[in-house]
């Protein structure tokens, strides 16, 4: 069901991995974000809101709460009033559940749309490409909102594997106070102005 919806999105690379990225060739700025363990940290409450928005609350409860968060475990080493503590998933994708990845991938699109709406209200945003947990956004302001939104969801960005225009990258470094970092030019031509951020320990 969700796979069919994504097939109709020209910005989705599930069924053609290069096509959505080819559309962005020639963009002035492109921000490629690599997410850290996105499928493990993607909050179920966000998935619930996405499915509820697309369908209804009852369907969202069945898909997300009953399927994704149905695994309840007893923790024997933590006791609460003479009984074992019970825990369940509040983030991530359960192994073996067929619908978890398509739901996550579609929610990734919706997150980008929401970010774009904050910057360009009333405008259909198409200057991006999504392939599962990988995303390229060809708009500086939308990319900033996306980065902030991920922080709100508790999902981290691997800046060592992300590609960000040098001017924006330097401003991010100055704002965050990250001093233990170096820049290494990748295979991109010098005039592209694109650098890869790598940590010092990773170069050792």
Curated annotation (Swiss-Prot):
This is Uncharacterized mitochondrial protein AtMg01410. It is found in: Mitochondrion. It comes from the Eukaryota. The lineage of its organism: Eukaryota, Viridiplantae, Streptophyta, Embryophyta, Tracheophyta. The keyword Electron transport does not apply. The keyword Mitochondrion applies. One of its GO terms (cellular component) is mitochondrion. Keywords: Mitochondrion. InterPro entries: DNA/RNA_pol_sf (IPR043502), RNA_pol_mitovir (IPR008686).
